[in-house]
């Protein structure tokens, strides 16, 4: 009966898609994408999920950017040039003078200042990324200077993020926005920016119906090359099977969240192209370091036992991808490869649990979002975690939650033990330090404090933040990864494979390690 209901629901959803969007693919200028939406906001100062980054990359511009195909160099975007002070603490950007916002307003240094200060003061989910900026100042209409507390080699990479989008200050202020120090309490522009965009990207956000669809329209005032598609429609399809069926039927152009098995089922279909490759994402178990929240899982010995209990090869069989050496994404600068990955050892896990006083087993409640991302079902992985830990006497109760509720508990550090997915905020190894105190994931989300670390590790963290020479950085990040393999409240267990598929007449598809998908470079064969 349950299977019948599932099949009926699938065909009902496909019928709805066809009735609403069925003519879209017949019109060459409309792009339809199936995805599992995971955003809670499109306001650049508040939204901080993969869905947010994809949409805001299309609707906003930043001072600098990466090439379309990779993250190999920093390129000008709204800034046509920049200078760095001798001590590495002041970055001065000269703005291009032909760029305008979607409503036709000129982009000025004051807009840059407003956008950065609002990001800092709004205290939204991504605001921490601007913590390392002491001040931002408009020198004149076309020149803006950032002052940092200390030299930071990753700064230019950081500000490529859609979090640092330049917003139209006048439009945002007219709708309740402010960059004042009390913006967290007084700014009311969130609803406005979640329903439309105030940027200068190739598209404009026209409509967002949470957990249903997001619609973009072409920005006719775009200062760069006009995109091919007049309209882009993202349809929320939480199940990869639904995306696969819609793609095969020709009802969508691109299926963004497919499992390796689902992609394999599309092989040989001449109407469909397939992309596979390693992602920059990491699935991990997080154990709160406050005992009143996670109980025995605040104990470092128990945390290590959990790491030894997980069946790393099993997750690779389920979803493809690779086993991470640490939370740093496999394949990046200094990241441990599979040759240094953590290995399962059930005897060691049981020995550690006995050492911690739990030879007879213990109970765990595992919190996680009830969602699918990249074709990976969090429920399926959670059930696998449950089965793995049962083999060493840890009885796991699964607590799936609605994405917004689960995110709030995770981000506020109120969770006990959780299962989450993480991707880099910036394409620099410094981002790995988010998993070490006082990094955001470690401390704000998991209450792991800097003073709990040995002094030599604290010193390494401080040195890694300012090191610029490749050999020095390599040595520091290698040592820090060695430490976190054996210590700390995280158990990273899989870097999943990117598996997407699209209609063969869709041209220009590139999976990008930073913004994942750039709809502005796509076109359709005539």
Model features per residue range: what roles?
Residues 68-69, 162-227, 346-347, 351:
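Gly/Pro-rich hinge or "lid" segments in bacterial periplasmic/extracellular proteins
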